[in-house]
């Protein structure tokens, strides 16, 4: 079995408002999960239920994680930062707040998804400069926080691991690297929720070539952590008439919000080649760092799926992925 430690995003343990962050943390720990990505909105909800500041909430959550032997992996997601039209001074002030919370949580990473708004700068120098300023802010106090940059499949300026790696290399900061997610690789190059087949044209070739280039070109030390999730095949192909569709929203974003089960949960329609991606990203490059489950399953919204149930699903999913990786490696 792979030596990687398993983490999970707090939102992937439940999206029901009545399931509070401390409950999720205990459930993850009891299931044998080693780490957790704290989603800011979950922490904010917890602070309100406790009637305390978000800073005090972060300190309490850190203490709870120590008591339950759970490591905070990251604070996420600091969205739509690089190249945004709002003044950089305001964005850096917000970034400073997020970094303060990350340090109180003792989170080694602040996760930043690639910007996905349309009203943003396309200028490469601006994008790189913005990310350098944030990285420098993150390293200006102790403990240093590292920036985990995640290419979204619907990102405006960056939507592939290759684009993200190029940005990482140009930002050129020790505390700036990659957060890689199988959902984004799978939906950018292989899956298509608007196609009756569920697949893009030349899907297998595009994905295979991408993974080969990844193994050849991606430096292992710039992979900060890897997120795993699958995607559900749409029974009725996506269109603007689909009940989940929103005007102006990318179809991959819609897909992400509603239909991202844990890897290999075929009973929920999971069908992406997650094992192929995970094998390249983890085994073939010798990555031994954190693996985190980041799923968005609409079945978790109404409260019928408890954090305990979700945590068990996550552990079983990771077990299945490891078994499949080993099985394919022997072929």
Residue ranges, per PLM feature:
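Boundary/entry segment of secreted carbohydrate-active catalytic domains
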Residues: 1-20
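Acidic (Asp/Glu)-rich catalytic clusters
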Residues: 2, 23-31, 50-74, 93-106, ...
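Hydrophobic faces of well-ordered beta-strands that scaffold small-molecule active sites
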Residues: 4-10, 36-38, 72-77, 110-112, ...
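A short, acidic, flexible beta-alpha connecting loop/helix-capping segment that sits on the rim
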Residues: 13-16, 43, 292-309
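Acidic/histidine-rich catalytic cores of soluble enzymes
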Residues: 36, 133-268, 325, 329-330
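Glycine-rich, proline-tolerant flexible connector loops at the mouths of alpha/beta enzymes
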Residues: 37-65, 114-121
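Active-site acidic/histidine proton-transfer and metal-coordination neighborhood
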Residues: 64-68, 81-180, 187
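C-terminal helical cap(s) of enzyme catalytic domains, especially alpha/beta-barrels
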Residues: 302-330
């Amino acid at each position: 079995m792979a030596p990687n430690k398993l983490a999970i995003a707090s939102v992937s343990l439940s999206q029901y408002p009545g399931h509070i962050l401390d409950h999720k943390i205990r459930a993850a720990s009891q299931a044998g999960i080693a780490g957790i990505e704290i989603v800011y909105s979950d922490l904010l909800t917890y602070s309100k239920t406790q009637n305390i500041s978000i800073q005090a909430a972060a300190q309490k959550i850190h203490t709870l994680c120590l008591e339950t032997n759970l490591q905070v992996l990251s604070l996420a997601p600091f969205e739509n930062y690089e190249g945004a039209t709002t003044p950089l001074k305001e964005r850096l002030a917000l970034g400073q707040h997020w970094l303060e919370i990350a340090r109180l949580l003792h989170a080694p990473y602040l996760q930043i998804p690639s910007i996905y708004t349309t009203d943003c700068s396309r200028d490469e120098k601006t994008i790189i400069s913005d990310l350098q300023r944030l990285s420098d802010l993150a390293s200006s106090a102790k403990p240093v926080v590292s920036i985990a940059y995640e290419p979204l499949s619907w990102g405006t300026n960056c939507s592939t691991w290759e684009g993200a790696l190029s940005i990482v290399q140009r930002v050129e900061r020790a505390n700036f690297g990659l957060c890689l997610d199988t959902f984004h690789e799978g939906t950018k190059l292989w899956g298509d929720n608007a196609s009756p087949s569920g697949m893009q044209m030349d899907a297998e070739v595009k994905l295979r070539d991408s993974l080969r280039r990844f193994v050849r070109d991606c430096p292992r030390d710039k992979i900060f952590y890897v997120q795993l999730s699958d995607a559900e095949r749409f029974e009725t192909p996506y269109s603007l008439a689909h009940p989940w569709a929103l005007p102006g929203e990318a179809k991959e974003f819609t897909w992400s919000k509603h239909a991202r089960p844990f890897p290999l949960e075929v009973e929920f329609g999971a069908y992406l080649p997650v094992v192929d991606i995970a094998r390249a990203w983890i085994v073939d490059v010798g990555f031994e760092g954190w693996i985190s489950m980041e799923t968005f399953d609409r079945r978790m919204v109404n409260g019928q799926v408890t954090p305990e149930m979700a945590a068990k699903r996550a552990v079983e999913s990771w077990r299945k992925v490891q078994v499949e990786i080993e099985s394919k490696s022997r072929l």
